[in-house]
UniProtKB/Swiss-Prot annotation:
This is Adenylosuccinate synthetase. GO terms for cellular component: cytoplasm. Keywords: Cytoplasm, GTP-binding, Ligase, Magnesium, Metal-binding, Nucleotide-binding, Purine biosynthesis. The keyword Transmembrane does not apply. It comes from Candida albicans (strain SC5314 / ATCC MYA-2876) (Yeast). Pathway: Purine metabolism; AMP biosynthesis via de novo pathway; AMP from IMP: step 1/2. Homodimer. Its cofactor is Mg(2+). IMP binds at D12, E13, G14, K15, N37, A38, G39, H40, T130, R144, N226, T241, R305.
Amino acid sequence: MCDVVLGSQWGDEGKGKLVDLLCDDIDVCARCQGGNNAGHTIVVGKVKYDFHMLPSGLVNPKCQNLVGSGVVIHVPSFFAELENLEAKGLDCRDRLFVSSRAHLVFDFHQRTDKLKEAELSTNKKSIGTTGKGIGPTYSTKASRSGIRVHHLVNPDPEAWEEFKTRYLRLVESRQKRYGEFEYDPKEELARFEKYRETLRPFVVDSVNFMHEAIAANKKILVEGANALMLDIDFGTYPYVTSSSTGIGGVLTGLGIPPRTIRNVYGVVKAYTTRVGEGPFPTEQLNKVGETLQDVGAEYGVTTGRKRRCGWLDLVVLKYSNSINGYTSLNITKLDVLDKFKEIEVGVAYKLNGKELPSFPEDLIDLAKVEVVYKKFPGWEQDITGIKKYEDLPENAKNYLKFIEDYLQVPIQWVGTGPARDSMLEKKI
C-alpha cells in the first residue's frame, strides 16, 4: 500500500521534513510529478542534503527511489543533484531508478521558458515561473511532440537517429516561435549522446516497478511536489505549475490504481505563503507579513525568492481537502507564530457582501473577495522543540483544535522548530 505526502496550499509547506520522518520506515520512495522546480533541505546529523528532483528517500540506505513517469527530467540537473549528494557521502546510485516514460527537459525548454516569461512581463501577466523549463516540457508532452527517456536510452542505432530527428524538429519549432535565440543544438546533442550510456543503468519500466513493489507488500511513500493550489486544473490558474499536483497526479504519474492508496497526508503551514504572482486573499502587506517572512525565513530553496506571507486560510484548505481527501494533517512551523499577541485565521470569503459557498475559480472574483477572519489569542512563548502535544500552550492547542474542527481532519504531526527532530506526533 502507498502513503502519500501532498502540499495543501501554494507550496513550501515543509513536505520534505515529514517525508524525512516517514522515510526511516519505508521500502520505496517515489516522485510522481514536477521537476527540479521545487526544493527542500534535509539535515541528517550535521550534513545538509538539498533535494530538487530526486526522491528524499535516498537518505535511507535501505530505501529504493523512483523518479516516476509524471516527472520531467533535466538530465544535467539530475546528475548534478546526484553527484552533490554523493559528494556529501550519500551512497545512493544503486537505489535510484528513473521511469522510461518520463519526459526530458532540454536546455532550449529552459531558454524558451525565460523568453515566454519576459514576453508576459511586458504585458504585466508574468506567471512567476522558476525558468527551469518545466512548463514548456509539459507543453510539448501535451502536444505529443515531446521526447521521453526511452527514446534516449534505447541502444538500437535507429532509435538514436529518431531521437535526433525529434530533437531538431522541436528546436526548429521553438525557433520559429521565438526567433533565432542563442543556442547550440549540436553541442546539446553531443552531450545527450553521452547521456545515452550514463542514464541507461537507472532506467526502469516504472509501472512494473511499482506494481511489483505493491504485490510484495512493500511500504511505499509517494512524495508530492508543489501543492494543490498550484495544480494545473484545480489551482489558481493560470498562476500555477504545469502538472497535476494533487492526488490525481499521484495515480497518473506513477500508473497505480486508487485502491493502492492508504493514507493521504496533507502538509499545512501554520500560516500561508506564496511565491510568484496571483491573488492571495490573506496576504499581509504589513508588519505581520514582514514578521512571518523574517521569523519563518521565507526564501525559496530553488530560486532564493522572497515568499509572500499571510494568515492561515481555511477556505483554501477546505477546498484542498475536498480534492485530495486528507486522512490526517501535518501542521508545520507553528513556532513561527510564537511571538504574536493575536493570530487571525481566514474562515470565509465574501463577494459583494455575500458569503461564497466555496473557493472561487475566477481570479477576478478571488482578487476582490473580502476575507472573514476569526481572531485567536497568541501563546507568546517559545514552543521550539516541544515533543509532546500535551506540553503545548493552551492557546496553541486551541488554535490547532479549531483547524481540526473546521476541516474535519485530524492533525497527526506538529512542527515546533527548524531542527529535524522538532516534530511532535499527536495520537489520532
